């Protein structure tokens, strides 16, 4: 499970949910897997890995995407207990596993994140961005909720009865494209604007994003009532 549900609409898990889930899974003999593909590598700001937000330790962690900063690479990290299960003669084989170019790039990505304090940037600049988005939420009734952590944020668009406004979400993303800003939607109803910029995003970038969001939210089409 993802520590913050991404394609489900940037949904933050209730406090204690993951701890309780892990307990039930382990009592049933299962293993706990944390999908860190989207939320990992400091993007959430408060922690390097998403599972750390919930005070749990998974048995398996899956990582990818930002690991190579555009270059294809993924990895699975597991506990020693699970790794030892492969010591019985069973062998895992992957034709492209351990590719030296991919591994070299991933190593540099990890170093770059650390050298440039990008987790701290996600915390501080992402926090600033969320505060500015909440200001828009108070200004425009169409914004049902702003949620997320660091540079992993979502804006849910709803009417006064909390009905999802997918058409308005699509309108907004297409209008933003006209200003050179590429965004997309998530969630089962397609009404959540996802905001996941590169974690080198700075305050000036945030201000530009807010400027155009404010402009579009003020357009007649976005006034649903």
Regions found by a protein language model. Name each.
Residues 1-225:
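Conserved N-terminal phosphate-binding loop of PLP-dependent enzymes in the Aspartate aminotransferase
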């Amino acid at each position: 499970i993802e520590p913050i549900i991404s394609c489900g609409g940037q949904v933050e898990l209730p406090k204690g949910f993951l701890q309780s889930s892990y307990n039930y899974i382990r009592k049933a003999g299962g293993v706990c897997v944390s999908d860190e593909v989207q939320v990992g590598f400091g993007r959430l700001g408060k922690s390097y890995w998403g599972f750390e937000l919930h005070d749990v330790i998974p048995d398996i962690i899956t990582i990818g995407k930002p690991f190579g900063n555009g270059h294809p690479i993924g990895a699975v990290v597991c506990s020693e207990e699970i790794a030892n299960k492969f010591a019985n003669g069973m062998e895992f084989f992957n034709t492209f596993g351990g590719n030296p170019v991919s591994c070299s790039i991933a190593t540099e990505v990890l170093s770059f994140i650390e050298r440039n304090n990008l987790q701290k940037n996600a915390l501080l600049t992402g926090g600033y961005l969320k505060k500015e988005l909440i200001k828009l939420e108070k200004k425009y009734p169409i914004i049902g909720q702003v949620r997320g952590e660091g540079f992993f944020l979502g804006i849910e668009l709803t009417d006064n009865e909390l009905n999802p406004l997918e058409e308005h979400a699509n309108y907004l993303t297409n209008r933003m494209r006209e200003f050179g800003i590429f965004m997309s939607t998530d969630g089962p109803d397609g009404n959540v604007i996802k905001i996941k910029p590169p974690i080198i995003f700075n305050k000036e970038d945030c201000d530009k994003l807010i400027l155009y969001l404010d402009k579009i939210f003020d357009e007649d089409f976005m006034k649903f009532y």
